């Protein structure tokens, strides 16, 4: 319709709008697929196929019948309904369908006897649409055609179905006359049956105050004269569950509230009170309806019962049963003396039980037994079974529901019997008042049955509309083809098909006692998983969705089975059938013996389906008439028309489908005269040449080239969109004509204006040109005169200026020349004096410089001689040190070679033991392999049996087996890759052997370097002798004197050097002795760890490197000594020439010779060291050869073990794969357990087993050096396991704090950093540490224990966040600093690197975190959040108890201060004041270790004496239970919490978050309590609450912002509410003051609630002004219904994330933290002290 319409620029169209459904506008631009529309100033771009044409000639008040619309589409229908609704015309036809829009107000002009007279006998469609017209049409057809009629009224709850039904029955009663029946008219009885059924079958719902909770079909019988001769009422699916369950703000059935509002003598007889005292009624806060008096309705219902023939005795029995149901609801059950027995809870329950028994007129004990016990009849005997309290409560509710259902059925039967049916009547008019389509947030069995009814009626409706369309085409005698319409038969088959439908499956599930809603839902999923109308919600497990004609509806199956079962408990049946009250016993007649013996299961669904089928059979024999009731808005207020809401109802009611069916044929139908009048302009010649309307219409349509139209007898029938195309042609013709007219008019106006403008411009130009010429001539005259005047004036001025300038220049030149001569003379005098002064000063300066230079030269010479002597002494010292180092190195090498030989002998013995253990292990593995094969064979047999038994699920098992095979293939590929990795490692080991050959080559180079060293030493000695000889000759020749002090210093340095050499020799002897003592210990350690050979080789390599370094340093020093000797020779010559010393030279020569002899001794010592080095190298080569042999043997043994373990693991994996694929994906538990069983036997042959159960391969020897990264990582993974138990035993206790930092967290962190666990690829240490933190959650009641572990966990997490650095995606490790080459350099670097990490947060050590470390970090994060949540819930639980006591005390104090106390209020209305003893905070029995005192201020003298304990928080006596003491108990509890957290040094940001959420919880509890009851919204209550808030504010100020943060701001809702309560007088408060100044935070719902609750009837000044309340109420009506809750919600989320722990925790220096006392003396944890 929209796509085929021709849209041009200027056309008026409808465009979709999300707010108003459709808006109109004018087309501004048309593209190929999109158009631009101007909608009242707003430009909208829409697709061409999403717009509908608008009728520009639409009548202002709309049309009575929407089939007369030029464009029959959704926006046209909405516009027509809205125009008529605004004009109070609420009824509109759509063909034969009447649409009624509920006005929510009385319209007197539409009802009354006068209106009925107007419609009596009038043809359908002559008068305005009205239900009377529909009723009259049905009545006339029944009389004239002799066919029974039916009027179907449908619509949403609140759409006006009940009122429309009343009007229909009123009109039919008016038309049927007054045939008397036993003194009472039948029509009056039919009309009066409505209030009776409404009292017992209607209730208030969210959408309607008088919603029918049952379906009703009234059959009115007529005789041959058209008089009412009888009637029958049929009801469907009464909502039983409403008797026991009512949601707020709905109500139960009206009869309960009417009976409670009955006269006093009635309520006393039935022992009733207010509705709020009964559990079946007080589940909702709504007890009364606006504009409805329940007491008057009670009397009206009594009168209606009299009319329909229910006598007073029966009426008394009816209300006796209703009262008994109310008393049944107040019976509560508790556990009895036996374990699974139950009994009435208290005296109150026994009272209601007694009253209910009296009203039922049965035995009270029998009633109690029927509720608390069940009799199970077996073949031999009867067994009495006791019920628990929950089962007894369910039985009580079942009894109430079945009694009420029986009562309602009795009423319907009684009404039918009273009215009577005419057996001779052949024609009826049925009025169906049925519930409309329902879709709520929670849809149960009732909605399922209601929507099934609507599906049935919709199918009937579609078929009927299609038939009417057929009749219209046949009447006009046009050619038409079949019209396709939606057939919802597939939905009906889905629901009611037997077998296989949803109802059939539900009945089947109800017949099995063990069936639950879960099994029922799974059965539905399996049966209808491929059905296009059935779906399963993604996030639900038991819900299902059905695609109805009106939309998708999701049903919850929780109560389907219970609501579908229609049974009466045998005990209840027997009890009530034997009642002394005849009315009660008539409700439960005794069952026939045959039916009781052979009872067949009957369900509500099956009964309802049968009733529905009977209804449709009745409707099929009648001619239907349809009335669709529409609710214009959800506010239930007049004059509000919501387009989207109405459009949804029209779709659900099938109106739009009827329109679609109409549009599928020929929706546009115009009479000939109207068609020609509208479109004559397209072809004027057709109307001029012919007066035949039919012929003219055909010519007109042929000219516009329209296809597919039909010409009927009286009308033109157009297809969908053809009317828009005709309007488009008409708009083009009108537009073209308008443009021609506009062009001619504009041409005439423009020409006329141009001629006038031309004449005027000619005159103006002549005048202007004359004026311009005159002005130009005058200007030329003035310019000529001015030039002559200027010439004369300039000549005179120039002459005078020249004369003055000449005289001035002569005067100035004279003065300047004189001044220059004087200046020149003065300069010459100054220059002569300056030369004289400079010559004297330069002479003096040269003399002084010469004196200073001479003195400095003498001083420099003396200092230089001292420097030369010291340099020589330093060289001698260095030579002595190098000699000692060589001796030490040689001794160590000898000792290590001896140790290596002894270790080799031990290794041979160990290899023999390994071979024996290997053979034993192979035998064990073979036995295990045999067992596994047997298990495999048994498993296969079991599997084959299961497959044969479970052939129905063969497909699923094949899929699982396919997944298992894929997993096995993947595991096999992983094992093959692991085998390849092991082969690569073996190749690396062989490369390691080649490395020993490289070491031998390096040893040869060492020999060469030692020989070169010897040569250089000899050369240095030779040079030294030459220098000494030259010095002696110079001394003899020139008689120099050596500085005595320098020689003395040289001697002392020489003595020190000797002492140093002797001390080094003593140290070498001591090291030899220690080595002899420690060698046995090293031998035993070799037995424990096979990898010791790697350490020996690495030590040898390090020693080799050290020797190289020593040789290099000696060469460097020798070179320096050679250079120094040359320099000294030259310096000596200079000294001998410059100065002459006066000391005796002979003595000095002897000392020099003595020093030379000592130097020779040192050279001899060096040569002996070289010999020892040669011997050490030989021993090293032999050790290398032995190590190579040992490595080969170890590799062979490890290869055999690894192959056996690999085959073992593969077999175990196959068995585990066949047992469960899911278990393999999570963790290879079987392989892990098997590997751990084998690990003690082979622990000495390799690394320990990993977490996943695979054996870690032998660490490969790197290609170049033993100290590579992979080798060290394997070492660090094995090292700390033996120390973890000691660590865990220590930190699992409360080891306290040091300097305010947790010792346990820092100890764990230091150990993990020391052991390099964070860099390990696989480790089980984290799995052993995590349970330590998990143990803190086990004791959830100990706040002190939880706070201690929260501090430790958060601190450790903080350190990990600062330390761990995740590896880059490439996996390359960061660049490391260069490694020193010498042995001592590497040792010192190792000491520095393995020391305890610097824990200052400014320089936290960064490490590359592996996957186990990152997983450990995530686990710590989860524990921090869990501990925080547990502590918060403990605090909330205690605060809730204290607040309950506080609120109770406030209420009691306000009741004491009031003048009158209401004695009728039951104790149940009071807020329950829980004993704080139940939820008091439990203090830990353990005390923290001594902590350093902090300088924090304690709020309100925070001390341990003030902190509440279990005993201190018990329920106080009535004398102490005052508001002040209650608030004080809250303050004391907050003090206790703060002290606990401060003692445990909980991070400040966590403390602030905790108090913030605690105060938020206090705010929610106080604020909700104020808004829930009227007695709390008083000035006295506000003053008392304000006093308590002042106490909390004082506590916050004393506790300081450091701990509580902005917690005080969380009480803003309660504070503002209290301010409003205590403000006096309230009548002067304006709306702006209320919403801006006083209560800016509160919402409109909350303000309206407070203002309405704090009303005082006696004093108007205490009330808020009505204007303010009306403004708030107006805002409430405009706001969304979803924002109607005035209560606050508690926030239970975690208020921080992991990143906040790192950013919010204050940076601390952890360097000064003391270690735990238990680890202080342990030598393995000495690094903690560093």
Curated annotation (Swiss-Prot):
**Complexes and interactors:** Homodimer.
The job of this chain, per UniProt, is described as: Myosin heavy chain that is required for the cell cycle-regulated transport of various organelles and proteins for their segregation. Functions by binding with its tail domain to receptor proteins on organelles and exerting force with its N-terminal motor domain against actin filaments, thereby transporting its cargo along polarized actin cables.
Q: Which residues form the Dilute domain?
A: 1327-1678
- What residue stretches are annotated with the Myosin N-terminal SH3-like domain? 8-56
- Protein name as catalogued: Myosin-7
Q: Name one GO molecular function term.
A: cytoskeletal motor activity
| InterPro entries the UniProt entry points to | Dilute_dom (IPR002710), IQ_motif_EF-hand-BS (IPR000048), Kinesin_motor_dom_sf (IPR036961), Myosin_head_motor_dom-like (IPR001609), Myosin_N (IPR004009), MyosinXI_CBD (IPR037975), MYSc_Myo11 (IPR036018), P-loop_NTPase (IPR027417)
Name of the gene encoding the protein in the UniProt record: XI-A
- What Pfam family is a match, any one? IQ
In this chain the Myosin motor domain maps to 61-731
Which chain positions lie within coiled-coil regions?
A: 883-1224
Which stretches does UniProt call biased (Low complexity)?
A: 1456-1465
């Amino acid at each position: 319709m929209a796509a085929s319409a021709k849209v041009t620029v200027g056309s008026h169209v409808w465009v979709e709008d999300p707010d108003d459904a459709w808006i109109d506008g004018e087309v501004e631009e048309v593209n190929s697929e999109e158009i631009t529309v101007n909608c009242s100033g707003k430009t909208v771009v829409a697709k061409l196929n999403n717009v509908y044409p608008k009728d520009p000639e639409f009548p202002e008040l709309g049309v009575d019948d929407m089939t007369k619309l030029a464009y029959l589409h959704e926006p046209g229908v909405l516009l027509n309904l809205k125009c008529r609704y605004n004009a109070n015309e609420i009824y509109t036809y759509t063909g034969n369908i009447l649409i009624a829009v509920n006005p929510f107000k009385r319209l007197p002009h539409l009802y009354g006897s006068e209106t009925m007279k107007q419609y009596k006998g009038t043809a359908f469609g002559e008068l305005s649409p009205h239900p009377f017209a529909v009723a009259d049409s049905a009545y006339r057809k029944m009389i004239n055609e002799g066919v029974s009629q039916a009027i179907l009224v449908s619509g949403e709850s609140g759409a006006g179905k009940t009122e429309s039904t009343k009007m229909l029955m009123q009109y039919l009663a008016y038309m049927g006359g007054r045939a008397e029946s036993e003194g009472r008219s039948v029509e009056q009885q039919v009309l009066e049956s409505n209030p009776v059924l409404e009292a017992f079958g209607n209730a208030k719902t969210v959408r309607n105050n008088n919603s029918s909770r049952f379906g009703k079909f009234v059959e009115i019988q007529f005789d041959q004269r058209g008089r009412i001769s009888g009637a029958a009422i049929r009801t469907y699916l009464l909502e039983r569950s409403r008797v026991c369950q009512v949601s707020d703000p709905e109500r139960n059935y009206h009869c309960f509230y009417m009976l409670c509002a009955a006269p006093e003598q009635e309520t006393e007889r039935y022992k009733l009170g207010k509705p709020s005292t009964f559990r079946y009624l007080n589940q909702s806060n709504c007890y009364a309806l606006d504009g409805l008096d329940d007491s008057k309705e009670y009397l009206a219902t009594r009168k209606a019962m009299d009319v329909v023939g229910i006598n007073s005795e029966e009426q008394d029995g009816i209300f006796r049963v209703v009262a008994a149901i109310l008393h049944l609801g107040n019976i509560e059950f508790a556990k009895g003396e036996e374990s699974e027995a139950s009994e009435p809870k208290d005296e109150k329950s026994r009272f209601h039980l007694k009253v209910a028994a009296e009203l039922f007129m049965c035995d009270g004990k029998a009633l109690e037994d029927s509720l608390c016990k069940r009799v199970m009849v077996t073949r031999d005997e009867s067994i009495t079974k006791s019920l628990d309290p929950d089962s007894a409560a369910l039985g009580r509710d079942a009894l109430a529901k079945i009694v009420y259902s029986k009562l309602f059925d009795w009423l319907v039967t009684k009404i039918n019997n009273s009215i009577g049916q005419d057996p001779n009547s052949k024609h009826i008019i049925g009025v169906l008042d049925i519930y409309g389509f329902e879709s709520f947030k929670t849809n149960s069995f009732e909605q399922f049955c209601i929507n099934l009814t609507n599906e049935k009626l919709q199918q009937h409706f579609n078929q009927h509309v299609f038939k009417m369309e057929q009749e219209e085409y046949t009447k006009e005698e046009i050619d038409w083809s079949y019209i396709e319409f939606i057939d919802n038969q597939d939905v009906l088959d889905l629901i009611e098909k037997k077998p296989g439908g949803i109802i059939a499956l539900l009945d089947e599930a109800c017949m099995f006692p063990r069936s639950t809603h879960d099994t029922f839902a799974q059965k539905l999923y399996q049966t209808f998983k491929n059905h296009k109308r059935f779906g399963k919600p993604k996030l639900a497990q038991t819900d299902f969705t059905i695609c109805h004609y009106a939309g998708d509806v999701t049903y919850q199956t929780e109560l389907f089975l219970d609501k579908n079962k229609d049974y009466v408990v045998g005990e209840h049946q027997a009890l009530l059938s034997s009642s002394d009250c005849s009315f009660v016993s008539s409700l439960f007649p005794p069952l026939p013996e045959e039916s009781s013996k052979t009872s067949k299961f009957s369900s509500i669904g099956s009964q309802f389906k049968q009733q529905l089928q009977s209804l449709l059979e009745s409707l099929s024999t009648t001619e239907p008439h349809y009335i669709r009731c529409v609710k214009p808005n959800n506010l239930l207020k007049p004059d509000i028309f919501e387009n989207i809401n109405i459009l949804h109802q029209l779709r659900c009611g099938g109106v739009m489908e009827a329109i679609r069916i109409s549009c599928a044929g020929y929706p546009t139908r115009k009479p000939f005269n109207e068609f020609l009048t509208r479109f004559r302009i397209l072809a004027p010649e057709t109307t001029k040449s012919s007066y035949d309307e039919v012929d003219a219409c055909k010519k007109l349509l042929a000219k516009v080239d329209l296809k597919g139209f039909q010409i009927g007898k009286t009308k033109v029938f157009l297809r969908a969109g053809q009317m828009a195309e005709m309007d488009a042609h008409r708009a083009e013709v009108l537009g073209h004509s308008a443009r021609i007219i506009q062009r001619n008019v504009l041409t005439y106006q423009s020409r006329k204006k141009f001629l006038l403008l031309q004449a005027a411009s000619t005159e103006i130009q002549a005048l202007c040109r004359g004026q311009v010429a005159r002005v130009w001539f005058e200007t030329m005259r003035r310019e000529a005169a001015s030039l002559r005047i200027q010439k004369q004036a300039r000549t005179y001025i120039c002459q005078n200026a020249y004369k003055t300038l000449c005289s001035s220049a002569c005067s100035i030149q004279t003065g300047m020349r004189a001044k220059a001569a004087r200046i020149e003379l003065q300069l010459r005098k100054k220059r002569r004096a300056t030369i004289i002064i400079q010559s004297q000063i330069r002479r003096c300066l040269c003399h002084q410089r010469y004196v200073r230079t001479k003195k400095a030269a003498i001083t420099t010479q003396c200092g230089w001689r001292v420097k030369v002597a010291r340099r020589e002494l330093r060289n001698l010292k260095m030579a002595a040190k190098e000699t000692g180092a060589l001796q030490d190195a040689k001794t160590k090498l000898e000792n290590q070679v001896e140790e290596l030989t002894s270790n080799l002998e031990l290794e041979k013995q160990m290899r023999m033991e390994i071979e024996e253990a290997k053979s034993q292990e192979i035998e064990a593995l073979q036995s295990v392999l045999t067992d596994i094969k047997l298990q495999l064979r048994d498993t296969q047999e079991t599997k084959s049996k299961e497959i044969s038994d479970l052939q129905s699920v063969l497909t699923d098992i094949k899929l699982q087996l396919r997944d298992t095979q894929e997993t096995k293939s993947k595991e096999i590929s992983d094992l093959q890759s692991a085998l390849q990795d092991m082969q690569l490692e073996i190749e690396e080991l062989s490369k390691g052997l080649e490395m020993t050959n490289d070491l031998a080559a390096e040893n040869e180079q060492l020999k060469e370097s030692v020989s070169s060293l010897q040569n250089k030493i000899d050369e240095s000695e030779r040079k030294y002798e030459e220098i000494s000889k030259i010095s002696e000759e110079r001394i003899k020749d020139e008689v120099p004197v050596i500085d005595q002090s320098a020689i003395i210093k040289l001697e002392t340095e020489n003595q020190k050097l000797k002492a140093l050499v002797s001390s080094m020799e003593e140290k070498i002897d001591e090291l030899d002795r220690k080595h002899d003592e420690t060698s046995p210990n090293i031998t035993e350690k070799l037995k424990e760890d096979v990898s010791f050979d790697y350490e020996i080789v690495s030590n040898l390599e390090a020693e080799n490197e050290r020797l190289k370094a020593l040789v290099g340093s000696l060469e460097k020093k020798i070179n320096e000594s050679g250079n120094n000797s040359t320099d000294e020779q030259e310096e000596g010559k200079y000294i001998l020439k410059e100065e002459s010393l006066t000391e005796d030279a002979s003595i000095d020569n002897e000392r020099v010779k003595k020093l030379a002899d000592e130097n020779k001794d040192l050279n001899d010592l060096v040569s002996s060291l070289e010999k020892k080095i040669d011997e050490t190298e030989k021993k090293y080569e032999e050790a290398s050869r032995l190590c190579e042999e040992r490595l080969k043997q170890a590799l062979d043994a490890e290869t055999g073990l690894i192959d056996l373990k690999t085959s073992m693991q593969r077999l175990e994996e196959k068995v585990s794969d066949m047992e469960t694929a899911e278990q393999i994906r999570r963790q290879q538990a079987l392989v892990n357990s098997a590997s751990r069983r084998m690990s003690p036997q082979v622990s000495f042959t390799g690394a320990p087993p990993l977490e996943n159960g695979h054996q870690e391969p032998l660490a490969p020897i790197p290609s170049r050096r033993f100290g590579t990264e992979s080798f060290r990582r394997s070492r660090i993974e094995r090292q700390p396991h033996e120390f973890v138990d000691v660590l865990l035993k220590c930190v699992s206790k409360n080891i306290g704090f040091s300097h305010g930092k947790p010792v346990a967290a820092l100890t764990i962190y230091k150990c993990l950093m020391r052991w390099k666990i964070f860099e390990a690829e696989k480790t089980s240490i984290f799995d052993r540490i995590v349970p330590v933190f998990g143990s803190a959650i086990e004791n959830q009641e100990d706040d002190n224990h939880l706070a201690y572990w929260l501090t430790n966990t958060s601190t450790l997490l903080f350190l990990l966040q600062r330390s761990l650095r995740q590896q880059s995606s490439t996996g390359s490790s960061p660049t490391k600093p260069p490694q020193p080459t010498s042995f001592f350099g590497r040792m010192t670097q190792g000491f520095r690197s393995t020391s305890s990490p610097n824990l200052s947060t400014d320089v936290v050590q960064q490490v590359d975190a592996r996957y186990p470390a990152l997983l450990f970090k995530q686990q710590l994060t989860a524990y921090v959040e869990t501990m925080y949540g547990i502590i918060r819930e403990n605090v909330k639980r205690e605060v809730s108890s204290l607040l309950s006591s506080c609120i109770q005390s406030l209420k009691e104090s306000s009741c004491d201060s009031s003048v009158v106390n209401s004695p009728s209020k039951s104790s149940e209305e009071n807020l329950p004041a829980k004993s704080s003893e139940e939820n008091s905070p439990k203090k830990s029995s353990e005390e923290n270790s001594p902590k350093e005192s902090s300088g924090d201020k304690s709020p309100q003298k925070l001390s341990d004496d003030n902190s509440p304990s279990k005993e201190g928080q018990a329920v106080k006596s009535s004398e102490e239970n005052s508001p002040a003491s209650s608030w004080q108990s809250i303050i004391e509890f907050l003090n206790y919490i703060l002290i606990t957290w401060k003692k445990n040094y909980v991070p400040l940001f966590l403390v602030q978050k905790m108090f913030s959420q605690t105060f938020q919880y206090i705010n929610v509890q106080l604020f909700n309590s104020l808004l829930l009851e009227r007695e709390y919204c008083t000035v006295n209550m506000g003053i008392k609450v304000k006093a308590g808030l002042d106490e909390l504010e004082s506590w916050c100020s004393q506790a300081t912002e450091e701990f509580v943060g902005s917690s005080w701001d969380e009480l803003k809702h309660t504070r503002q509410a209290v301010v409003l309560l205590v403000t006096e007088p309230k009548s002067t408060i304006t709306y702006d003051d209320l919403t801006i100044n006083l209560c800016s935070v509160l919402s409109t719902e909350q303000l309206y609630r407070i203002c309405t609750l704090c009303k005082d009837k006696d004093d108007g000044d205490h009330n808020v002004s009505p204007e303010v309340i009306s403004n708030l109420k107006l805002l409430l009506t405009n706001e969304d219904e979803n924002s109607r809750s005035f209560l606050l919600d508690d926030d239970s989320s975690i208020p921080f994330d992991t990143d906040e722990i790192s950013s919010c925790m204050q940076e601390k220096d952890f360097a000064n933290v003391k270690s735990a006392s238990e680890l202080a003396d342990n030598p393995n944890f000495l690094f903690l002290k560093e």
